[in-house]
Amino acid sequence: MEKKPESIFINRELSWLDFDSRVLALAKEKTVPLGERIKFAAIFGSNMDEFFMVRVGSLYDQTLLKNNKTDNVTHMTAAEQIAAITPRVAELQAKCDKYFQHLVSALAQEGYKKVDFAKLAKPQEHFWKTYFQRELLPLLSPQIVDSRHPFPFLNNKDIYYIAQLHSKNEGISYGIVPVSSQFERVLFVKDGETTCFAFVEELIAHYAATIFSASTVQKQCLFRVTRNADITVDEGMMDHDVDFRDVMSELLKKRRKLAAVRLQFWPDAPQEIVKFLRDKLVVPADRCYTQTSPLDSGSLFKLAGRISGDGGHTALFYPAAKPMQAPAGYDLYTEVRKHDVLLAYPYQSIRPFIKMLLRAGADPDVVSIKMTLYRMASDSQIVNALIAAAENGKEVVAMVELRARFDEQNNIDWSKQLEDAGCTVFYGFDDYKVHSKLTLITSRVNGQYKYLTQIGTGNYNEKTSELYTDLSFITTRQEIGEEASAVFNNMALQRLTSEADTMLVAPLRFKTVLLEEMDRQIALAMQGKPASIILKNNSINDPQIIDKISEASCAGVRVDMIVRGICCVRAGVPGRTENVHIRSLVGRYLEHSRIYCFGSGEAMRIYIASGDFLTRNTERRVEVGVRVDDPAIAKKLRGILDLQLRDTVNAREMQPDGTYAKVRPAEGQPPVDSQMAMFGYFQNGFVQETDKPEKPKAESKPKAAAVKAAVKPVPRQRAALRPKRAGLLQSLFGRGKK
């Protein structure tokens, strides 16, 4: 019997959990400072929350359908995927509990001792009981569940205390006490040279029985509910007489009440209570987990933050590393007219970009500023710069994606403020999320329109620009500006951009271009010429791209992939992906930039983009990228890739079985931390040229053609009347988000 060829595909959900495993591994990595290890444990917990809310929630929805479709990569049904991820989640949670105990022990050696409420001495017992009675008890809202009192609604990600009660008159009932999210999650008390810390839910659980003094508490525990957060916009909601913000607001209300998909319990949770909650919330046994680590990992961020704030513990955290500021007198708005500019976050500050927006908003030659907005800071200076421009009389067009998951409300709020300032706000496509990072500043000089275009890999968010690695390419090349203008015009008219020369625009001109680039490398390899592909992004599961990568490998093309998260292609499979080398970088900063490089030397073609290689990016989103033709910047981008391929600190390399092994330095060689090395790499990144001649004018390209998206009506677009101008400072600092 002929042996079945080994699959090159990995299930998306299992690959997501593999990424979470790599994050969790840093919680035990001894080369990582203790305070940072606590944060990685917290990040792991936050990632698991999202995994259940989004992925398990979606799979749960699919199991309810009669036509149970399969995963397009591994062809597993939703039920099969849930069955596969269940033991993996349990394994990871057990590791997290083990690492948490190690962290607690290590903290004790540093003078931070966790309170064990089962072993309190009398003075401590008196202190904590008094604190509970004075500070917490008046704010608690206990609820009884019996024949006369229905089971209450339990909020997503909130912690609850539950007790099984018995009284002579009423028999068995249950008492539930919400642990208010308004409470300080971690409490700190000095005890001599030691700082004691306690999780507030454990304190409440220790004394909560006193609330139900009329009954006998037979059993008790803490638990936490995770609910499905996978909301979709139905066709019936696309009534264009209704403001789309109202639709999203209603969906957000519905999301709060979606089905429970996970229950977390204290260790040794009584089975009677577990069964009671399972029955009430309709959660199967395989999605109920007990854990010794905090039920809400967010409290670990609070713990690390307090230790950092105490001072004197610098060795417990990464050395300070702030984004490099531009030199005095550096003016990006002027500089980009002399040469293309690349900014790399978090190594360089985002401030020059913000100042560029402010300069444009005050420039009398500027006619309009257009920008796509996906995830914004809650107190966004970037959005305030747009508001200031509108109040200065500029036409400001903001494409706000209201469906950015978990940022919907923030985006709704900002869209209202933009509209109030006189900006034109529209919400993109019915069927495609707009995930692009695109800014276009249009000026009219001597009767001609001139463009300044910015294309990025990351959000317009000052906060995350210090945490995520991203790239921002800024140019005044006329041909790129014309293509960007066509993209904005097409989006406003609900049309998809299908033609461009330098830009990539998903879903019609993103995957096709990159597949053509791979085909060129395959053709070179078939001719015996040097050929190479380097792909850096966050995730990949597009089967068409995976098949092309396999084809390239079989043709002899070396394919290097730097994929931080989900990776559904298996490296090193004989006869399929032997020439594919995959690594994941997980470290101090979240790797977020996307760089696609084909060939080397003078023949090299290199792109940056907002989109990954997930099918949702290549086929169901409007993504934007650009081929970088500036030789100096192209070389800089290639240098980033080469440096990351040499990393021996943050890198883990995929093995042929799909597992990852930590990359270690060769014997006698120093470790290479590509993230920290970037600070040196971009040390002179703010290039100033005072005497460089202007670039020769490129021939004007025909405007990008567009194909109409299937059955697209007039866009949801509103433009409020322009209010009176309020002045720059007031508009920047007087409009804090409510």
Task: Identify the role of each PLM range.
Residues M1-I533, E551, A555, C567-K738:
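N-terminal localization/anchoring segments of enzymes in phospholipid and broader phosphate metabolism
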Residues R558-I562:
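Hydrophobic alpha/beta core scaffold segments
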